[in-house]
Amino acid sequence: MSRVGKKSITLPDKVTVKVNGSSVQVEGPKGKLSWTLPEGITATVEGNQLSVDRAGESRQLRALHGTNRSLLNNMVIGVSEGFVKNLEIVGVGFRAAVKGNILDLNLGKSHPINQVIPEGLKVTVTENTKVTVEGIDKQVVGQFAAEVRAYYPPEPYKGKGVRFVGEVIRRKEGKSVGK
């Protein structure tokens, strides 16, 4: 049995889960998410516990068991608390601003970068260099934050670029001058 898959998910008070065949809908104070379970994986709600079971012992079903349990757990956390990713922009003249549903980034390139903010995400910029991404879907929040970071990953010599708050950048020494 999958160690992750056999753990049941405790549902907070304000979260409701509806299982309709292979479709699972999770609703909470922050919003609503739905997920379709693959064939052979079932979910059941008993009281305030959500459990995920599998039909057989095939290698693929064992792999999907823990994965789908984790995805459902992330949905429950998302609709009750939400997910947050914090990014910081380091560099002279590097800045960010939100204009409608577009995140405008100036990262020292010859042109500004306009990243469309996906529906369901709330992006805020403070001090022109601190970007906060909030949402109920963990995958969408992480994907958007990773895309923003990928425009200018932190470089090891001066540390310029877009990084996650708390991310440690291995620094390198520059070239040493000869005699």
Swiss-Prot record:
The lineage of its organism: Bacteria, Pseudomonadati, Verrucomicrobiota, Verrucomicrobiia, Verrucomicrobiales. This protein binds to the 23S rRNA, and is important in its secondary structure. It is located near the subunit interface in the base of the L7/L12 stalk, and near the tRNA binding site of the peptidyltransferase center. InterPro entries: Ribosomal_uL6-like, Ribosomal_uL6-like_a/b-dom_sf, Ribosomal_uL6_a/b-dom, Ribosomal_uL6_bac-type, Ribosomal_uL6_CS. It comes from the Bacteria. The gene is rplF. GO terms for biological process: cytoplasmic translation. Keywords: Ribonucleoprotein, Ribosomal protein, RNA-binding, rRNA-binding. One of its GO terms (molecular function) is rRNA binding. This is Large ribosomal subunit protein uL6. Part of the 50S ribosomal subunit. Belongs to the universal ribosomal protein uL6 family. GO terms for cellular component: cytosolic large ribosomal subunit.
